[in-house]
Regions:
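Q-loop/switch helix immediately C-terminal to the Walker
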Residues: 88, 96-112
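Helix-to-loop junction immediately C-terminal to a conserved catalytic motif
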Residues: 53
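ABC ATPase NBD coupling module
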Residues: 15, 19, 57, 69-83, ...
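The feature captures the beta-strand-to-loop junction immediately N-terminal to the Walker
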Residues: 38-40
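Hydrophobic anchor residue at the start of the ABC signature
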Residues: 159
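Conserved ABC transporter NBD signature motif
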Residues: 61-69
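A short, flexible loop at the N-terminus of ABC-type nucleotide-binding domains that lies
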Residues: 1-4, 10-24, 36, 74
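Conserved ABC nucleotide-binding domain
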Residues: 130-148
Length: 159
């Protein structure tokens, strides 16, 4: 379950550029719910989703995932509770790393990472099977750099 209560965010408070982006937003999604966030430009859609992900601290309110209050958790710790698919396929992957390295790094979300992105042979085989299901031939290109993929291919790797 995702629950946001009274989430507020003001950018540049007290300045001539002050922008009240979120004004007490409430949202409750139960497990299995599907939601679409719709609004005009500047309505606060991305700001709200970024607040949930922890891109910046909220001014007030609470955000819970599965009953765990993540309101004050840094973004990297929230990664164990939240997955994101970015609009821009260039985000969410590291273009200068191979497909296999991106998948290995993603599989360790929420864990401390060392200096190596390598994966174990059984993990590589699991990645190959997952990619084969996409029917894009990416399972044969595990050593290709993600930056060389099309936008759609890159989006699929990110997901």
């Amino acid at each position: 379950m995702l629950k946001a209560q009274g989430v507020k965010k003001t950018f540049f408070p007290g300045s001539v550029n002050e922008k009240r982006a979120l004004r007490g937003v409430d949202l409750t999604l139960e497990d299995g719910d599907f939601a679409t966030v719709i609004g005009s430009n500047g309505a606060g859609k991305s700001t709200f989703l970024n607040a949930i992900a922890g891109v910046f601290p909220i001014d007030s309110g609470t955000i819970e995932v599965g009953g765990v209050d993540i309101s004050d958790m840094p973004e990297y710790k929230r990664a164990q509770y939240i997955g994101r698919v970015f609009q821009d396929p260039m985000r969410g992957t590291a273009g200068n790393m191979m497909i296999e390295e991106n998948l290995a790094m993603a599989s360790r979300r929420g864990q401390k990472l060392g200096l190596s992105w390598s994966s174990k042979p059984e993990q590589t085989e699991k990645f190959r099977e997952m990619l084969k299901e996409l029917d894009l031939g990416l399972e044969e290109r595990m050593t290709a750099h993600v930056g060389l993929l099309s936008g759609g291919q890159r989006q699929r790797v990110a997901i």
